[in-house]
From Swiss-Prot:
Keyword S-adenosyl-L-methionine (UniProt): yes
HAMAP family, sorted: CbiD
The name this protein goes by in its record: Cobalt-precorrin-5B C(1)-methyltransferase
Keywords: Cobalamin biosynthesis, Methyltransferase, S-adenosyl-L-methionine, Transferase
Catalytic activity: Co-precorrin-5B + S-adenosyl-L-methionine = Co-precorrin-6A + S-adenosyl-L-homocysteine
UniProt cross-references to SUPFAM superfamilies, sorted A to Z: CbiD-like
Coiled coil (residue ranges): none
NCBIfam families according to UniProt: cbiD
Entry keyword annotation includes Nucleotidyltransferase: no
EC numbers: 2.1.1.195
Pathway recorded for this protein: Cofactor biosynthesis; adenosylcobalamin biosynthesis; cob(II)yrinate a,c-diamide from sirohydrochlorin (anaerobic route): step 6/10
Enzyme class: transferase
UniProt GO molecular function: cobalt-precorrin-5B C1-methyltransferase activity
Annotated source species: Alkaliphilus oremlandii (strain OhILAs) (Clostridium oremlandii (strain OhILAs))
Length: 357
């Protein structure tokens, strides 16, 4: 277990190490075992973050032709779907003095242009490739074939963003620092940007559809808006600016009333820890519509956005949704500093769907 911590929002969170570090450590351990014929319990590697790691070696195997072992991924306190996965390396000798690195079972393959490698190549990022070769060279200057594999990879990959960014069949071996820093919003946002890059390559720069999550995807499917679509989670502002500056000619945003009520009053990170303005949004637009004070007070007492919406509709003010959609469009244009930009916002309810006005 890595004894390294960061403080985030007043909490002490433990760091972990990347799949790239796991692959490099497994490769080094396997190379040592192949050369010495001795089983290792631990292996030490350097990381690009200049933080050394001493990692436990699992399932070691040695025979005259090859050696293999696994390192178990530890994501620390980061909510990482690959936490606990076993990353294996099998090392065989070559006669030409070169190190060739391959992806085996459970390692994804690149299926779209525009990523860090070529189509058909194993999804092992450049920094992990460098780490693997460096650690192999710390053992010997001989030639080796190194195969990285993850028996659980194909199953775990279904819980990741890989399919959306053009990687299929398994996980990616990633990490630019070798260390996992907990709760990395930067990594999530970069993934969203990569998805937008893939949309551009596949569909061009006409219209892009942005949805916060899975339900937004389902609603967009029912509206016939299933292509050129990216899930953006709560990072609406970052996503808008990236899409606009990338040159998309128009945008369509589809989201639940709970998130997009906030957007309608200019909240561009809709996570509950950042801001809650749901009832405030209802009250603002109801006031502009001239709604009676009694209705406004009733909505102010609602606990959820769905409840607030029901109150409005029952009182004959269902058009508040249309006002919120229009308001959100205006806020977006102001945010990206383009008052004439074509943007469409569609708000849905879990019970009532869309077009509630």
């Amino acid at each position: 277990m890595l004894d390294l911590y960061v403080i985030k929002e007043g909490k002490r969170l433990r760091c972990g190490y990347t799949t790239g570090s796991c692959a490099a450590a497994a490769a080094k351990a396997a190379a040592i075992m192949l050369e010495t014929g001795k089983v290792l319990q631990f292996v030490e590697i350097d990381t690009p973050a200049n933080i050394p790691l001493k990692l436990e070696v699992h399932n070691p195997s040695i025979d005259p032709e090859k050696a293999s072992c696994a390192i178990v991924k530890d994501a620390g306190d980061d909510p990482d779907n690959t936490d606990g996965i076993e990353i294996y390396a099998e090392v065989r000798k070559r006669q030409d003095g070169q190190v060739h690195i391959h992806g085996g079972t459970g390692i994804g393959r690149i299926v779209r242009k525009g990523l860090f490698g070529t189509v058909g190549q194993a999804a092992i990022n450049p920094v992990p490739l460098q780490m693997i070769e460096k650690e192999i060279r710390a053992v010997s200057d001989k030639g080796y074939d190194v195969t990285i594999y993850a028996p659980q990879g194909e199953v775990i990959a279904k819980k990741t963003f890989n399919a959306n960014i053009g990687i299929e069949g398994g996980i990616s071996i990633i990490g630019t620092k070798g260390i996992v820093y907990p709760m990395s919003e930067e990594a999530l946002i970069k993934t969203i940007y990569m998805e937008m890059d893939m949309v551009e390559q596949k569909h061009g720069l006409s219209n892009i559809i942005l949805v916060p999550g899975n339900y937004g995807e389902k609603i967009s499917d029912t509206l016939g808006l299933s292509e050129a679509r990216v899930k953006i989670s709560n990072y609406i502002g970052d996503s808008l600016l990236y899409a606009y500056n990338k040159g998309f000619q128009s945008m369509t945003l589809i989201g639940h009333i709970g998130k997009f009520s906030k957007l309608s009053i200019g909240v561009f990170n809709t996570h509950s820890k950042v801001c809650d303005g749901r009832m405030e949004a209802f009250i603002y637009y109801l006031a502009l519509m001239g709604a009676p004070r009694q209705l406004i007070e009733e909505v102010n007492g609602a606990v959820t956005a769905e409840e607030g919406l029901h109150i409005c509709i029952d009182a004959g003010y269902g058009e508040v949704i249309k006002k919120m959609e229009q308001g959100a469009e205006q806020k977006i244009r102001k945010y990206i500093k383009d008052e004439n930009y074509p943007v469409k916002v569609i708000i849905y309810s879990m019970e009532r769907g869309v077009h509630m006005g």
